[in-house]
Amino acid sequence: VSAQQKVNIKVWKGGKAEIIEQIDSVTFPNTMQHLICIDLGLSVKWASCNLGAETPEAYGDYYAWGEVKAKENYKWNGYKYYEPISKKITKYNTSDKKTILEASDDAATIILGNEWRIPTTAEMEELVKKCTWKWFEDEKSGYCGYWVTGPNGNRIFLPAAGCMNGNEPYAAEFYGYYWTSEVVSFESKLAVHLFF
């Protein structure tokens, strides 16, 4: 959350005011107070809802893989690590041979702090294989997705939030796409993801 306007601002601390002149922006941490860790009885804990969502059934924000901000255009020419003239990926590629997101490119880490990160492929596979998945559709509210119940009985909800296709949402209420922190290979333009 941020506020932007060039003004003087009065900051209060310990009952004393200090005027700071010509502030051009103020950024407030997005703490997502509603987000909690859910222990499903797996190797890692899982978030109670998607990034940017206030409830488990809400879609939240959409992110391009390796980008840490939601945006309006998800076309290749707007991708952070795409060079349009050569049509090549500039990071996580054959040159650097990186296949796993660095913390600086992990939306969960940047938005929520160092104790959060996007799951690895192995962690996503564990979620799929060791949990019970049950499709849920609420006709009244219109939300749908999977209740994912862990071996210990705790559960999370993964909404069928679809994905972004260019600047338009695609397949919301029908499919879910969830990133892992890994690319298929450094020779690929594809990241490993959960699809349902």
For each feature predicted by the language model, list its residue ranges.
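Structured surface patches comprising rigid loops and adjacent beta-strands/short helices at the edges
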Residues: 16-28
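Bacterial Sec-dependent N-terminal signal peptides
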Residues: 1-6
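Acidic/polar residues in short coil/turn loops that connect beta-strands
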Residues: 13-14, 152
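A short beta-strand micro-motif
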Residues: 7-12
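C-terminal, surface-exposed recognition/capping segments
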Residues: 33, 39-196
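Short domain-boundary/entry signatures in modular proteins, especially
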Residues: 27-35
